[in-house]
Swiss-Prot record:
Keyword Kinase: no
Subunit structure: F-type ATPases have 2 components, F(1) - the catalytic core - and F(0) - the membrane proton channel. F(1) has five subunits: alpha(3), beta(3), gamma(1), delta(1), epsilon(1). F(0) has four main subunits: a(1), b(1), b'(1) and c(10-14). The alpha and beta chains form an alternating ring which encloses part of the gamma chain. F(1) is attached to F(0) by a central stalk formed by the gamma and epsilon chains, while a peripheral stalk is formed by the delta, b and b' chains.
Topology relative to the membrane: Single-pass membrane protein
Its job: F(1)F(0) ATP synthase produces ATP from ADP in the presence of a proton or sodium gradient. F-type ATPases consist of two structural domains, F(1) containing the extramembraneous catalytic core and F(0) containing the membrane proton channel, linked together by a central stalk and a peripheral stalk. During catalysis, ATP synthesis in the catalytic domain of F(1) is coupled via a rotary mechanism of the central stalk subunits to proton translocation.
Organism: Acaryochloris marina (strain MBIC 11017)
Transmembrane intervals: 28-48
Top-level taxon in the UniProt lineage: Bacteria
GO CC term (a single one): plasma membrane-derived thylakoid membrane
Entry's localization field: Cellular thylakoid membrane
Keyword Transmembrane helix: yes
Protein name, per record: ATP synthase subunit b 1
């Protein structure tokens, strides 16, 4: 209330004719009137807006803190999931290497076995064919070679199908590795 009285008395001293008349009138000095209005508006904003603004800031701060904590939790969860998936990938790659090594070992054993059987078969045919002419011997040897090759391929294919038949991912990895060994892109 003291501020109002001060402003009123200051206004009266600026206009002595109004003070003598004993009343108030409009103040036409724009700068002086704006200053008074600004002081009143700022005072009202501070008085009434303090609670609203403080409450808004508290709510906003809580929302930001919640968002940050959720983001941190999501980041930790994602890091844990990534570690698990990398571990699973490493295990799958190790298993694929084992399967490939076993397949190669079995294929080489099958090849050696087929070659040994072919040698004994060739020897048997040579012994039996010594009575035939040399032309019939050559035909028989060529035929045996063809059969042995066909048998070897069938045996290797059967062994690979037995080992890799139910494991599509191992088949896919074996094919990709074979293509890579040949210089292709998978």
């Amino acid at each position: 209330m003291g501020m109002f009285n001060w402003l009123a008395s200051a206004g009266m001293t600026g206009f002595p004719q109004l003070a003598e008349a004993g009343g108030y009138s409009l103040n036409f000095d724009i700068l002086e009137a704006n200053l008074v209005n600004l002081v009143i508006v700022i005072g009202l904003l501070i008085y009434f807006g303090r609670g609203f603004l403080g409450e808004s800031l508290v709510k906003r701060r809580e929302a930001i803190e919640t968002a940050i904590s959720e983001a941190e939790a999501n980041q930790e969860k994602a890091a844990a999931t990534l570690a698990e998936e990398q571990e699973k990938l490493a295990q799958a790659q190790a298993e694929a290497k084992k399967i490939l090594a076993n397949a190669q070992t079995n294929a080489s054993k099958a090849k050696e076995q087929i070659l040994a059987e072919a040698k004994t078969e060739i020897q048997r045919i040579k012994d039996a064919g010594s009575q035939d002419t040399s032309a019939s011997q050559e035909r028989a040897i060529a035929e045996i070679r063809q059969r042995v090759t066909a048998m070897a391929l069938e045996k290797v294919e059967a062994d690979l199908k037995n080992q890799l038949g139910n494991n599509e991912s191992a088949q896919r990895k074996l094919v990709d590795q074979s293509i890579a060994l040949l210089g292709g892109n998978s």
